[in-house]
Amino acid sequence: MKELEYPFDSGYLLKKKRSIKRLLLSDGSVRIKKKIAVLGGSTTNDIINMLELFLLNYGIEPTFYESEYNRYWQDAVFGNEELDSFSPDLIFVHTSNRNILKYPAITDSKEQTDALFAEQMKYFETMWEKIAERYHCPVIQNNFEQPYFRLMGNRDAFDCRGRVNFINRLNTAFADYAASHESFYINDINYVSACYGLDKWSEPSYWHLYKYAMCVPAIPDFAFNLAAIIKSVFGKNKKALVLDLDNTLWGGVVGDDGVDGIEIGQETHMGQVYAEFQKYLGLVKDTGVMLTVCSKNDEENALAGLNHPEGSLKPDDFIMIKANWDNKDRNIEAIAAGLNIGQDALVFLDDNPAERAIVSAQLPTVAVPEMERPEDYIRVVDRSRFFEITAFSSDDLKRNEMYKENAVRAAQQAQFTDYGEYLHSLEMVAVIDDFLPVYLSRITQLTNKSNQFNLTTKRFTTAEMEQVFADDSYIRLYGRLADKFGDNGIVSVVIGKVNGDTLDIDLWLMSCRVLKRDMEYAMLDNLCDRAKQRGLKTVKGYYYPTAKNKMVKELYGDFGFTKVSEDADGNTVWELSLSGYEPKNKYITVERNK
């Protein structure tokens, strides 16, 4: 919904929140359901109302537990029967500088301020440890906005007795805690309040009248930032940028002005703007976001523009380049198909409002931000939080290279008339083995991102995955696939629970990067072999349909399983006898971890 995309009208959202919610709930979208506990050190009702709108727009339907006013610490540390029975999927702790127990006094010594700092950190760490111990779910914790006043002026920043200094120390300690604890995230209200304007954010009347830790008009900005973290935790990030060229990556029209006539580089102020935007996009690419081009241009001109010596993005930085005179919505469909990702994983950037309108109308799940002034391009993309990072792995760093290698594989496939011969030619080698601690973060990340080849779409938090890893009643497999063109990284995960003489498959997923390579057969062979080694007789598989996983509806049937039941919603149960099972993998050499 456009009204909920950055930049939004906060006043309109606050006024129309009920009608917007009705529209979202009646739009026919399929959403994942999540339970979110909000433990507040100040009033949280309007925050929850606004957060709900942004999450619904992201494809998440939340239900909320809301603590009583300023009971956040007690609920977490001493327990709460209602919160326990709610069994949250995620906990958000909403505190602000109003919840700092005590600030240093101007008469305190360095030793006294250090002791006060340690006391404050112990207060929060005790709460976080109790939450982890009791609820085993992701936690989002606000850091602190800057104080409303500086008693010592600029000295507040470096004097140990200054409030600014004390808050900065706490924020650094909060960040260090998040860096060393999985599934713990910081909602950076220090940054959000600075962007909004600290004087407006900290308007005292909202606290004294209503116990709001921020002014009410700032709540949509706060909720939007928080929602970005939550949607990332639950696998709703975008994956790729689709970029126009003329007046988007450079100033001017390369086909009319020539390469020498476009604006990019240090010679003009607008050239500097476009050069800075290209550098920003390069940084985004380095985080694992895929870059593609969709431009109405002759390909020769497009490539010439991308090879401009003052530009930092070159043709090799893009996985796909669609430079032709076809309608852009058709090209974007082809890009999604070529990358093997959903259209809802794409963000389209174009300076032309007519092109944006056409793509929005024809491809409503593609994100199309308003790109009005080149000077604002970075801010619009960055503040839209399309690519919020809550987990980061070495595979993310290599994603663009992996997809480019896929393009080379596709080119080689075209040379073969026999698909089996093509698979043989790839010289594929897979490592399939039990989980390793070093891979748990990547495995958890995959469970929250893979949607197409995912039979149950069960999601796991890091804590839940660690429980599975420690439980001998599970058979766990990760699969890593490499071939002569490169290493695809960890691409498949299977988790099966032993029940008597049966293995129930709780989770089976595979990255779309390796579809149609027969990796699923290699995983199945390994799974059945391990099940037989444990004396099991039957493997039972489950398929739960979603809007995105229809491609695996008959996977178990293709494997030779027998369908034993199907309900009115299309949920199916399948069984395979291990007696006489014959291996199915023909093309992949399988190794165990060395």
Language-model segment annotations:
Residues 431-511:
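A conserved beta-strand-loop-helix scaffold within acyl/acetyltransferase catalytic domains
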Residues 1-242, 249-250, 255-261, 354, ...:
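Extracellular glycan-modifying ectodomains
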Residues 484, 490-567:
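Acyl-donor binding region in acyl/amide transferases
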Residues 254-279, 364-372:
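Basic, amphipathic juxtamembrane/active-site segments
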Residues 297-323:
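Substrate-recognition/cap helix-loop segment adjacent to the acidic, metal-dependent catalytic center
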Residues 338, 360, 364-426, 529-594:
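Terminal substrate-recognition subdomain of acyl/acetyltransferases
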Residues 332-353, 359:
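Conserved Lys-Pro-Asp/Glu-containing loop-to-beta segment of HAD-superfamily phosphomonoesterases
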Residues 276-307, 359, 455-460, 464-465, ...:
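Substrate-recognition element of Asp-dependent hydrolases with the DxDx(T/V) motif
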